[in-house]
Amino acid sequence: MKLIPFLSEEEIQKLQEAEANSSKEQKKTAEQIEAIYTSGQNILVSASAGSGKTFVMAERILDQLARGVEISQLFISTFTVKAATELKERLEKKISKKIQETDDVDLKQHLGRQLADLPNAAIGTMDSFTQKFLGKHGYLLDIAPNFRILQNQSEQLLLENEVFHEVFEAHYQGKQKETFSHLLKNFAGRGKDERGLRQQVYKIYDFLQSTSNPQKWLSKSFLKGFEKADFTSEKEKLTEQIKQALWDLESFFRYHLDNDAKEFAKAAYLENVQLILDEIDSLNQESDSQAYQAVLARVVAISKEKNGRALTNASRKADLKPLADTYNEERKTQFAKLGQLSDQIAILDYQERYHGDTWKLAKTFQSFMSDFVEAYRQRKRQENAFEFADISHYTIEILENFPQVRESYQERFHEVMVDEYQDTNHIQERMLELLSNGHNRFMVGDIKQSIYRFRQADPQIFNEKFQRYAQNPQEGKLILLKENFRSSSEVLSATNDVFERLMDQEVGEINYDNKHQLVFANTKLTPNPDNKAEFLLYDKDDTGEEEESQTETKLTGEMRLVIKEILKLHQEKGVAFKEIALLTSSRNRNDQILLALSEYGIPVKTDGEQNNYLQSLEVQVMLDTLRVIHNPLQDYALVALMKSPMFGFDEDELARLSLQKAEDKAHENLYEKLVNAQKKASSQKGLIHTALAEKLKQFMDILASWRLYAKPHSLYDLIWKIYNDRFYYDYVGALPNGPARQANLYALALRADQFEKSNFKGLSRFIRMIDQVLEAQHDLASVAVAPPKDAVELMTIHKSKGLEFPYVFILNMDQDFNKQDSMSEVILSRQNGLGVKYIAKMETGAVEDHYPKTIKLSIPSLTYRQNEEELQLASYSEQMRLLYVAMTRAEKKLYLVGKGSREKLEAKQYPAAKNGKLNSNTRLQARNFQDWLWAISKVFTKDKLNFSYRFIGEDQLTREAIGELETKSPLRDSSQADNRQSDTIKEALEMLKEVEVYNTLHRAAIELPSVQTPSQIKKFYEPVMDMEGVEIAGQGQSVGKKISFDLPDFSTKEKVTGAEIGSATHELMQRIDLSQQLTLASLTETLKQVQTSQAVRDKINLDKILAFFDTVLGQEILANTDHLYREQPFSMLKRDQKSQEDFVVRGILDGYLLYENKIVLFDYKTDRYDEPSQLVDRYRGQLALYEEALSRAYSIKNIEKYLILLGKDEVQVVKV
């Protein structure tokens, strides 16, 4: 069809007016209409939380398709695979609806083609696009298309370590080994090895991977801070700060003398106050920096006289105490600032003195990093395995260096769209620039929700365009979506109240003004005073505890507060548990939260990413078992294995065995002592009684058999042999939380199998890999198990982004911000490059022998201090945005939960607000969310804030006050009469006589098989057959049935049956790792694991499998793996119509997606067919059985059923 012109500004305005005057219940806002229809220039849509940005994107795409644009001409980048799937589903519905509504034949045909092409559209993450791009164009850089992605963190770490040690050895033995040795020692710390340097190298490498060209950034920007260091300018800045601080101090003391000092006329401290004022008065306009520094030194010295009490107002008069306390508090604040400035003078002097040495160290570091980056890049090319960032770098390299490729994409894409633009990093931004023609970008995001700085996302990319487009519309169009269609007015008012007073350009990176404030738009939610946001504080004064370290007890109090509110919502207001979310900034306290909820019987569902897999007890036992099999001379691991439930040695037995040392040896490992005990070669052999000797023999025999088995067999087989030999898998299944424990053990075997499939072989390397993961303080993700259906959601704020819940509790408001980055030896900045702490060796000048002649001094470089200030502002801004995301998840009511001493919090004093914002020092000195909220509550008391605070003490949190969860026992009342045995043998004999009569009457029931499979009874549902049940099911077992025998086939060619292909295909679909990007190479590797012959493998069409995952259903499965269940066995009781007897149906479901209110069931079929309807009729009954089983199991009636037909050249997905 011909392209239909896009709307002009005048036409858009008319559309806005028509919409405003329409009688629609839910109208589009003027800004939404503008965002949907504006064209011909770059557009930035700043979409606040809940403003309908996904709706706008979908409508804009639909409008462009309706005007003749092809879906293949749109590049649409989403932040997650799930978001891409949801957008495709939304588009599928909208396009289908448009086709039904229009009478235009050309448009119908055009939209029909777009619907067919939708699965292949460029809608997805940047990672998925770059993978496909490199697969297609990688040959330009000599990259084979069958590359794989290094998604396994342990494998990546192993490769990284190997390359690091190679580069390390080359530098350690190279020409510059002396300067390199200095670099090594600079980061060695107490460890005195390479680990400190390695940690910093990996940190810098991760940062480099987020740049569009790592080597270029290393050469151009890494040393930028050293090159532009200006100590004269820094001294001038410091002098200005000293000048201002001294003036502030003078103003404070003069005010005190003029107003309050008369109350303390004879106080000794006033003489020292006058001395300080005299010192400050000695300064004038001609005073230089030296003079200011000298006065500062004398003022600080005076304050430290009399053990620091020279300026303290020590008045004890009750009526004057508040006045004295206020003076003393302010004086401390003033001198704390002066003390910091005094320290900065000394630090700046050291920085200048050691600047040359630090720069030399940085150059050595730059050389090492350059070699490491290149060596690691080459190693990954040899392995043909890359990180996602590598794929992006190669994509950029091709687009930059091959104009014909770049121009073909620029010509192809009518528009380059990106969602969640605030979380874009510099690689992605460069790629978007290269794909665009310069004026066809559509960017949607919200800088207030940029919370992925730890992944190198840079909100300033968004902010720079926001400011530029706002100032100059010729640069691009800025559209603001402020209306919130998600939350109640109470939630929005509270959020606005907080951020209007908290966030500005100085601290927060944006000014929270009318461009960013949330506007209530959900007319379905009427105002309700009960939904006013609450700031709940557990009062620590009531606990009687003084130890700050006793966090567990205090958190329990906070959690009891939360549990009380949850039970109130659930039992008094009828709120389902699944409508409640508990949000945390980190998972550090999740164990205590889960324990508290469990104690009160409240069901909970976590976000499934605990990342404490290696810390689970059952996995630790297995890892120690593998360590012992590899090397039994490891005492800790050996004791752990012996004490484990697999062998159950107690302390007494281990003590007896540990005393079995040979007389002629000074030291022996425990294993050697066990050998001595078996040989009775110790003087303490009398301690080994018969029972212990037999137990020891069994242990040693089993251990020897495992060690022997490990040599020729795979890790997977070894692990399962251990499980089976000692019934350990079954044992953990009987423990509390058994299914999760078994899932962990099952995952250990699978991870070992994946490890060996990744070109890494052997028990030794597997153990080394695990130890490296633990050493790096990393962990593997815990294994998910089926969550309860109605449960409170516990998740991190990061995980909650994009979600919404009626009731939201933000927990741990008192948890301190993570400032680990600011304590690092290295801080990086895109503007300044490397900031580093330099370890200087200084002479002390000490004469006495007991004093050290030299000391080591850690001196932060000038760039380090600059980067530290930049990092502090960026970190606080990110924490503000994190709080914003958390608060805007709530639909109805918001609870902010913290704890603290009421007395101390009420006594806190804060500087006055400035321009309606908290004082910048108040904001920058906050340690947690609670400090911000409390300061706002106190400073803006008169403003009638839309959230209230209240303290809850122990007296309100007793077990009786909290209450209990009302539960009904599922057990029926039992009657002992039902269990009485016959009193006499006579009664038993009479019962036996009745058996024959009973058997005759119920012959049909006796002949009914007690267990049947869906394939046996699917014939019940075939329209040409009898529906009676027993007779049909019994046909397969009929005595009168003719028996036929196949003649033997003597041909040498291996025959492959359809059943074999079907079984192998099912096993393949079960084994596919859906957490990784699916490629032909990864499927080929998975196919090798399938237990079948090579002839069968050759018959399986992997392209067809890949094609399935490009369908709408396939994409839905990939995007919802946390809801996915594969190869699930089931049993179901059914009643036979003829005999009226129950029988069991057993089968295995190929897979299903379990959502809250629906289930998507799918079944693979490899049968040959002419028309899909043939298989639909054939398997309709079987799917009906599956549907019944799922419906009974989950009490869900909405079940979608699909057949995935693999019997033809092209895969077909048919809804039944």
Swiss-Prot record:
<keyword id="KW-0234">DNA repair</keyword>
<keyword id="KW-0347">Helicase</keyword>
<keyword id="KW-0547">Nucleotide-binding</keyword>
<keyword id="KW-0378">Hydrolase</keyword>
<dbReference type="InterPro" id="IPR014152">
    <property type="entry name" value="AddA"/>
</dbReference>
<keyword id="KW-0227">DNA damage</keyword>
<comment type="subunit">
    <text>Heterodimer of AddA and AddB/RexB.</text>
</comment>
<dbReference type="GO" id="GO:0016887">
    <property type="term" value="F:ATP hydrolysis activity"/>
</dbReference>
<comment type="similarity">
    <text>Belongs to the helicase family. AddA subfamily.</text>
</comment>
<dbReference type="InterPro" id="IPR000212">
    <property type="entry name" value="DNA_helicase_UvrD/REP"/>
</dbReference>
<keyword id="KW-0067">ATP-binding</keyword>
<dbReference type="GO" id="GO:0043138">
    <property type="term" value="F:3'-5' DNA helicase activity"/>
</dbReference>
<comment type="function">
    <text>The heterodimer acts as both an ATP-dependent DNA helicase and an ATP-dependent, dual-direction single-stranded exonuclease. Recognizes the chi site generating a DNA molecule suitable for the initiation of homologous recombination. The AddA nuclease domain is required for chi fragment generation; this subunit has the helicase and 3' -&gt; 5' nuclease activities.</text>
</comment>
<feature type="domain" description="UvrD-like helicase ATP-binding">
    <location>
        <begin position="26"/>
        <end position="488"/>
    </location>
</feature>
<dbReference type="GO" id="GO:0003690">
    <property type="term" value="F:double-stranded DNA binding"/>
</dbReference>
<dbReference type="GO" id="GO:0008408">
    <property type="term" value="F:3'-5' exonuclease activity"/>
</dbReference>
<keyword id="KW-0413">Isomerase</keyword>
<dbReference type="InterPro" id="IPR027417">
    <property type="entry name" value="P-loop_NTPase"/>
</dbReference>
<protein>
    <recommendedName>
        <fullName>ATP-dependent helicase/nuclease subunit A</fullName>
        <ecNumber>3.1.-.-</ecNumber>
        <ecNumber>5.6.2.4</ecNumber>
    </recommendedName>
</protein>
<dbReference type="InterPro" id="IPR014016">
    <property type="entry name" value="UvrD-like_ATP-bd"/>
</dbReference>
<dbReference type="Pfam" id="PF00580">
    <property type="entry name" value="UvrD-helicase"/>
</dbReference>
<dbReference type="GO" id="GO:0005829">
    <property type="term" value="C:cytosol"/>
</dbReference>
<keyword id="KW-0238">DNA-binding</keyword>
<dbReference type="InterPro" id="IPR011604">
    <property type="entry name" value="PDDEXK-like_dom_sf"/>
</dbReference>
<dbReference type="GO" id="GO:0033202">
    <property type="term" value="C:DNA helicase complex"/>
</dbReference>
<keyword id="KW-0540">Nuclease</keyword>
<dbReference type="GO" id="GO:0000724">
    <property type="term" value="P:double-strand break repair via homologous recombination"/>
</dbReference>
<dbReference type="InterPro" id="IPR038726">
    <property type="entry name" value="PDDEXK_AddAB-type"/>
</dbReference>
<dbReference type="Pfam" id="PF12705">
    <property type="entry name" value="PDDEXK_1"/>
</dbReference>
<dbReference type="InterPro" id="IPR011335">
    <property type="entry name" value="Restrct_endonuc-II-like"/>
</dbReference>
<dbReference type="Pfam" id="PF13361">
    <property type="entry name" value="UvrD_C"/>
</dbReference>
<dbReference type="InterPro" id="IPR014017">
    <property type="entry name" value="DNA_helicase_UvrD-like_C"/>
</dbReference>
<keyword id="KW-0269">Exonuclease</keyword>
<feature type="domain" description="UvrD-like helicase C-terminal">
    <location>
        <begin position="515"/>
        <end position="802"/>
    </location>
</feature>
<dbReference type="GO" id="GO:0005524">
    <property type="term" value="F:ATP binding"/>
</dbReference>
<feature type="binding site">
    <location>
        <begin position="47"/>
        <end position="54"/>
    </location>
    <ligand>
        <name>ATP</name>
    </ligand>
</feature>
